[in-house]
Amino acid sequence: METDLNSQDRKDLDKFIKFFALKTVQVIVQARLGEKICTRSSSSPTGSDWFNLAIKDIPEVTHEAKKALAGQLPAVGRSMCVEISLKTSEGDSMELEIWCLEMNEKCDKEIKVSYTVYNRLSLLLKSLLAITRVTPAYRLSRKQGHEYVILYRIYFGEVQLSGLGEGFQTVRVGTVGTPVGTITLSCAYRINLAFMSTRQFERTPPIMGIIIDHFVDRPYPSSSPMHPCNYRTAGEDTGVIYPSVEDSQEVCTTSFSTSPPSQLSSSRLSYQPAALGVGSADLAYPVVFAAGLNATHPHQLMVPGKEGGVPLAPNQPVHGTQADQERLATCTPSDRTHCAATPSSSEDTETVSNSSEGRASPHDVLETIFVRKVGAFVNKPINQVTLTSLDIPFAMFAPKNLELEDTDPMVNPPDSPETESPLQGSLHSDGSSGGSSGNTHDDFVMIDFKPAFSKDDILPMDLGTFYREFQNPPQLSSLSIDIGAQSMAEDLDSLPEKLAVHEKNVREFDAFVETLQ
């Protein structure tokens, strides 16, 4: 489709759409894990905070999404779909919902890519966070365990709604207009759960009260063993290292001016899940979020829930491979300001050496490994970055001189000058003239006493006296009654005399009225 976008805007838009598609898959899959997700807010956004949301990516899901995209982007005629299905321990399966990210031909030529499209995609992603938790599949995912698990599948192409059965419902999450088309995010979900109602998914208690394997329980005791979520085929070597988080977002390290850089990444260590074979299915589940692969469906991720007894593995990288230790770069005191990362790490990642004598303890090594990256639309001074390595959205508006937070007047405002009140000065002058010893005034603290609605002539008044005095204020002069004024009876008595005077001078009054006309 021919558009009037320049090369930079087109590059920006493609990047926004790509990362929006990846974040969409993350939000949908994480909403079907069966666990509540609690994310703490942060005042210092990192490079992974795309669209102003702190969504922690699961590496396996990102890898699966990128493999499904295969370098493509959702466009007119090409839709990205995420299918959520349910599979029981007996082998029965049922599709629950299908999320579709597509684009139509309706264009908005006047919209700005840099700000407007980015902010609207952020709102659409927030709407998706809410909608994924109101469909029936969310309630089923919270109850998954030994009896059934929730699967997901990502595919690119025509939407397949035949598996949802009759009478399925559709909901449109939202739309965002772009210069190349309108992005639409919608969901079709099953409402007929007759397959579920005919079964009693009740967890039978064990015969003995002893748990032999307290780490993992197989969700499919009668089916084939589950493969770990490491995306290896049968012919691949068991020592294949899974790509790290920063490698999964390599597009962030390009010369893109309006997107945040890569995630809060490790410039030395890469995430390496344990390489487990088919025969070790019992230990295959605690991988990032306790997931496994179905042998018959290698692209479907098994997500056992909390009732299945599957623990969640700590979300930390695995240390200890010799290849990673060989890539550790050393920094001399002369060039300890910035140390370039090794080729295996992200291109724009820089570390700061914290060792003053060239020797680094294990704690210092960990400090030099992780670097905080500037996130989307963040213009906060950071010690670890320079103008040459700064890669933030709209970098042209960034300040030319990056100041440290210690000298930043917005972070540490200067102390206000101390002002001495006249009352305090007079008290100090009286004390100094009274004697040279000063022992009399050492036991007192001089304060500047300024009572509310007070004047200088009533400064000795305390708060109680002030309150009592103004509790009964004097009456207003406009409401005061003149004692010498005539009463109503006297006014009525003098009325005939006033009328007689008026009748006598009626001509003068008439002439005066005529002059007024």
UniProtKB/Swiss-Prot annotation:
GO terms under biological process: autophagosome assembly; mitophagy; negative regulation of cell population proliferation; piecemeal microautophagy of the nucleus; positive regulation of autophagy; positive regulation of protein targeting to mitochondrion; protein localization to phagophore assembly site; response to mitochondrial depolarisation
Biased composition (Polar residues): 342-358
Superkingdom assignment: Eukaryota
Effect on the protein of changing residue 444 to A: Decreases interaction with MAP1LC3A
Lineage summary: Eukaryota, Metazoa, Chordata, Craniata, Vertebrata
Name of the protein in its database record: Autophagy-related protein 13
UniProt cross-references to InterPro entries, sorted A to Z: ATG13 (IPR040182), HORMA_dom_sf (IPR036570)
PANTHER family: AUTOPHAGY-RELATED PROTEIN 13, PTHR13430
Quaternary structure note: Part of a complex consisting of ATG13, ULK1 and RB1CC1. Interacts with ATG101. Interacts with ULK1 (via C-terminus); this interaction is increased in the absence of TMEM39A. Interacts with ULK2 (via C-terminus). Interacts (via the LIR motif) with GABARAP, GABARAPL, GABARAPL2. Interacts (via the LIR motif) with MAP1LC3A, MAP1LC3B and MAP1LC3C. Interacts with TAB2 and TAB3. Interacts with C9orf72. Interacts with RB1CC1; this interaction is increased in the absence of TMEM39A.
